């Protein structure tokens, strides 16, 4: 348990988040903007706060995040993953409740590539028998 700050890297789809936890009052800063400014969508804000609410550390830390790549939901998921990892670095006993909630596991689902001769990844052109 370091006194200055804890770090966690989170990933989801093509988004990557670098998360720094410092003792503070509960401010969340993402790319030098507030949480409410960065995410217009309430669901994305809820996803980011989930690990803090679960471990009851909402007002215990100031969180500084740098996130790149992906879209809104991917970035929110990456930040959640990063916060989870930083919390585990801060206190190893938080691992088991976070694991039970499913926040520790990296969501491995990625976009499937488009194949040659198909319209999308799996959608085929219409078949004509005659």
From Swiss-Prot:
<keyword id="KW-0689">Ribosomal protein</keyword>
<dbReference type="GO" id="GO:0003735">
    <property type="term" value="F:structural constituent of ribosome"/>
</dbReference>
<keyword id="KW-0687">Ribonucleoprotein</keyword>
<comment type="similarity">
    <text>Belongs to the universal ribosomal protein uS9 family.</text>
</comment>
<dbReference type="InterPro" id="IPR000754">
    <property type="entry name" value="Ribosomal_uS9"/>
</dbReference>
<dbReference type="InterPro" id="IPR020568">
    <property type="entry name" value="Ribosomal_Su5_D2-typ_SF"/>
</dbReference>
<dbReference type="GO" id="GO:0022627">
    <property type="term" value="C:cytosolic small ribosomal subunit"/>
</dbReference>
<protein>
    <recommendedName>
        <fullName>Small ribosomal subunit protein uS9</fullName>
    </recommendedName>
</protein>
<dbReference type="InterPro" id="IPR014721">
    <property type="entry name" value="Ribsml_uS5_D2-typ_fold_subgr"/>
</dbReference>
<dbReference type="GO" id="GO:0003723">
    <property type="term" value="F:RNA binding"/>
</dbReference>
<dbReference type="Pfam" id="PF00380">
    <property type="entry name" value="Ribosomal_S9"/>
</dbReference>
<dbReference type="GO" id="GO:0006412">
    <property type="term" value="P:translation"/>
</dbReference>
<dbReference type="InterPro" id="IPR023035">
    <property type="entry name" value="Ribosomal_uS9_bac/plastid"/>
</dbReference>
<dbReference type="InterPro" id="IPR020574">
    <property type="entry name" value="Ribosomal_uS9_CS"/>
</dbReference>
């Amino acid at each position: 348990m370091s006194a200055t700050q804890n770090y966690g890297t989170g990933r989801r789809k093509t988004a990557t988040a670098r998360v720094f936890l410092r003792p503070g009052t509960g401010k969340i800063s993402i790319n030098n903007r507030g949480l409410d400014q960065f995410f217009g969508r309430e669901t994305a804000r809820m996803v980011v706060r989930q690990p803090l609410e679960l471990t009851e550390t909402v007002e215990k830390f100031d969180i500084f995040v740098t996130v790149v790549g992906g879209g809104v939901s991917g970035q929110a998921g990456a930040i959640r993953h990063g916060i989870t990892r930083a919390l585990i670095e801060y206190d190893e006993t938080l691992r088991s409740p976070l694991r039970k909630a499913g926040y520790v596991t990296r969501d491995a689902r990625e976009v499937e590539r488009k194949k040659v001769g198909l319209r999308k990844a799996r959608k085929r052109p219409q078949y004509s028998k005659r």
